[in-house]
């Protein structure tokens, strides 16, 4: 009798395990990702935020994907390998395909520049995606431009967003936001994965922000200066342009600073109908671009009146060497993070200026217009920064 009961109990245990395994199967409501190349059916995304891949590699011995905790890929009779991710955060994610130990882009995905190379990415639909969706509203232009920088004796490449009415009313002049990408990315980032143009188009159409120009340059180190090291000390910003990020990685901003101040701003003012003064000029950036913004705006209060730091540190009261001048010249300090970044080593790391919430509160107490924004349920990723731009833009250039 005991043996029978044991067998029954064992059968129930197996049944429970089987049911659990079944409930972990992906929900079968797959749709092609919006980030796919034209006509490609994979990758696909379901309502759980899981991503399904199908890679045709009939001679491969193994296939996988760079997302952690993904399922093992299985090979079908047609030579195609299929695998799934865990549920991912809403928004944009870079990835690579691994075939027999070699990392390659997914031939089904559009290509985006990230991790210092062109590669694949997938868009997981977000509940709040409406603010960066393509709608039937007037659209601005995202212009790809080459220009020559005398300070570095180099040809430069940039993108400039002009608002929908820019070409209709040729007597109107506009403020400018200088918007910087993160480490491992380039000047294409905000226009492509960041959806900056669509965000501004929609905000302008809804009457939530004044029209302004966005100028996007490469913030890396393209002409032979020192590369990132592990030895540079943290600084408090201001005129010293070497800044230590998480893990002691040092970023040297002096080369970009010279191009920005001596070449890029004069080029934009000389070739677009800008309001070419400090009250109508802003700077913002994500991650490394936020660190650049923090450092360079503190060093050039005569150039920028609005400051946006997205996941790139914050400004402490002790960073401000001339409080009277700062109060007079700076109209806004905006700091943002994804909620899943806060309290992590990325925020607490050297050179990030301390607790961002506390720093914003201290700036407010000192009489400086300061805003802290926390993107819900996101980490150090593009969904945090898209939302940050949405929150930042309506605060700019108020009379």
Language model feature labels by segment:
Residues 19-23:
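Boundary at the C-terminal end of the N-terminal hydrophobic targeting segment
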Residues 26-35, 39-71, 76-399:
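Non-catalytic cap/lid and distal C-terminal segments of serine-dependent acyl enzymes
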Residues 1-5:
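Positively charged n-region of N-terminal signal peptides that target proteins for export
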């Amino acid at each position: 009798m005991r043996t029978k009961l044991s067998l029954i109990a064992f059968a129930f245990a197996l049944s429970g395990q089987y049911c659990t395994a079944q409930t972990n199967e992906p929900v079968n409501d797959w749709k092609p990702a919006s980030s796919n190349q034209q006509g490609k059916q994979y990758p696909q995304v379901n309502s759980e935020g899981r991503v399904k891949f199908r890679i045709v590699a009939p001679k491969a011995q193994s296939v996988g994907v760079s997302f952690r905790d993904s399922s093992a890929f299985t090979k079908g009779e047609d030579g195609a390998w299929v695998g799934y991710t865990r549920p991912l955060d809403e928004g944009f994610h870079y990835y690579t395909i691994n075939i027999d130990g070699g990392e390659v882009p997914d031939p089904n995905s559009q290509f985006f520049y990230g991790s210092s190379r062109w590669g694949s990415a997938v868009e997981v639909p977000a509940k709040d995606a409406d603010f960066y969706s393509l709608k039937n509203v007037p659209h601005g232009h995202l212009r790809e431009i080459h220009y020559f920088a005398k300070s570095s004796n180099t040809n430069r490449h940039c993108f400039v967003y002009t608002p929908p009415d820019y070409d209709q009313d040729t007597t109107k002049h506009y403020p400018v936001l200088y918007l910087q990408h993160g480490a491992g990315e380039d000047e294409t980032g905000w226009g492509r994965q960041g959806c900056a143009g669509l965000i501004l188009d929609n905000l302008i159409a809804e009457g939530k922000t004044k029209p302004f120009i966005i100028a996007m340059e490469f913030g890396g180190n393209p002409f032979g200066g020192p590369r990132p090291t592990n030895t540079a000390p943290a600084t408090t910003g201001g005129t010293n342009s070497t800044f230590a990020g998480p893990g002691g990685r040092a970023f040297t901003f002096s080369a970009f600073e010279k191009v920005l101040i001596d070449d890029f701003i004069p080029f934009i003012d000389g070739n677009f109908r800008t309001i070419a003064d400090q009250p109508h000029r802003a700077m913002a950036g994500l991650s490394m671009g936020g660190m650049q913004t923090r450092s360079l705006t503190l060093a050039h209060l005569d150039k920028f009146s609005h400051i946006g730091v997205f996941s790139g540190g914050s400004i402490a009261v002790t960073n401000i060497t001339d409080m009277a001048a700062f109060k007079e010249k700076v109209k806004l300090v905006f700091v943002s993070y994804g909620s899943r970044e806060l309290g992590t080593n990325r925020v607490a790391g050297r050179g990030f200026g301390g607790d961002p919430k506390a720093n914003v509160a201290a700036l407010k107490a000192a009489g400086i217009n300061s805003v802290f924004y926390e993107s819900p349920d996101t980490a150090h990723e593009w969904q945090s920064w898209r939302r940050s731009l949405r929150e930042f833009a309506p605060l700019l250039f108020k009379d």
